[in-house]
């Protein structure tokens, strides 16, 4: 992750939705991001959108794991 401003996004989910979303995050792949990204978009730190998407997905997954939602 490039050095940038960190933002906080409050999120309130019922437990079943949090569990299902954690599963979704676990099952998402770099290829999923590649298919959905804009191949022409780059960010101010010169990273391609696919790489920023993938990093964001992994960061959200780690935050879920920190509060006990880490599917195997």
Language-model features, listed with the residues they occupy:
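Positively charged, low-complexity terminal tracts
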Residues: 1-15, 19-72
């Amino acid at each position: 992750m490039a050095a940038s401003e960190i933002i906080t996004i409050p999120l309130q989910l019922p437990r079943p939705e949090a569990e299902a979303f954690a599963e979704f995050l676990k099952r998402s792949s770099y290829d999923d991001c590649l298919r959905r990204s804009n191949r022409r978009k780059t960010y101010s730190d010169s990273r391609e959108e696919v790489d920023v998407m993938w990093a964001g997905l992994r960061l959200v997954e780690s935050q879920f794991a920190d509060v006990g939602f880490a599917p195997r």
